[in-house]
């Protein structure tokens, strides 16, 4: 019985992987591929998804990669995800803010059912970014918290340091540095006087000080 269960999980995972690969190939080869490819960075993949075996994670792998790279649930705080998911579903249905161009771009794209949309939203909200409580961390306004505050607020709400351990944070920060380089955000590879620089050591030090134990 256990073998049958594991086999079913493996078959399901392979099917989702094939589905995702097919979807990525479709949009990458479309006339709009270069634009779709730039929507989200490619550094987050299925192995990084929280609750990887859950229905929500499967729905994310099935639907979200039809138009762009896989989103990280932590890219938005829970309160923001309803607006984002609703907007994405409208676009998958061939509607949205680009008229006939949107319909053309979404040709062949499958939209989730109402039940799937609810499950997908619940998954993203459950694993969304927990915003930092500024009152709990007065160091944010001190020089030692500046590097973290300035760098991380460029793309999302400041995360609560208790979300990860210090070692986990180092891996997250390394991935975020790749994202910022990909998006042409401030990375500080060539310091220029007067421009803000990405200070990785200071960011990791701040996060390690308050990280989950």
Question: What do these predicted regions represent?
Answer:
Residues 18-22, 78-127, 180, 184:
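Extended, hydrophobic interaction surfaces within ordered domains
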Residues 55-57, 69-94, 154-182:
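Gly/Gly-Pro-rich "capping" loops immediately C-terminal to redox-active cysteine motifs
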Residues 1-6:
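Sec-dependent signal peptide recognition
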Residues 71-76, 126-139, 158-167, 209-213:
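Inter-heme linker and motif-flanking segments adjacent to c-type heme-binding CXXCH motifs
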Residues 61-70, 120, 148-159, 203:
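The canonical Cys-X-X-Cys-His
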Residues 23-58, 126-147:
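Electrostatic cytochrome c docking/interface patches
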Residues 106-135, 190-213:
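C-terminal capping alpha-helices of c-type cytochrome domains
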């Amino acid at each position: 019985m256990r073998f049958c269960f594991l086999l079913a999980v493996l078959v399901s995972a392979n099917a989702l992987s094939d589905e995702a690969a097919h979807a990525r190939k479709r949009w990458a080869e479309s006339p709009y591929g270069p634009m779709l490819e730039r929507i989200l960075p490619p550094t987050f993949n299925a192995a990084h998804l929280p609750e990887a075996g859950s229905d929500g994670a499967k729905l994310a792998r099935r639907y979200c990669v039809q138009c762009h790279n896989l989103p990280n649930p932590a890219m938005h705080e829970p309160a923001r995800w309803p607006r984002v998911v609703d907007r994405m579903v409208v676009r998958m249905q061939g509607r949205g803010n680009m008229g006939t161009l949107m319909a053309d771009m979404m040709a062949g794209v499958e939209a989730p059912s109402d039940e799937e949309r609810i499950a997908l939203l619940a998954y993203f909200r459950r694993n969304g970014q927990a915003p930092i409580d500024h009152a709990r961390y007065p160091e944010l306004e001190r020089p030692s918290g500046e590097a973290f505050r300035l760098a991380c607020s460029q793309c999302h709400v400041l995360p609560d340091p208790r979300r990860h351990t210090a070692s986990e944070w180092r891996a997250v920060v390394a991935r975020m540095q790749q994202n910022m380089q990909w998006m042409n955000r401030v990375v500080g590879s060539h310091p220029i006087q007067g421009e803000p620089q990405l200070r990785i050591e200071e960011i990791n030090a701040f996060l390690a000080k308050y990280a989950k134990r």
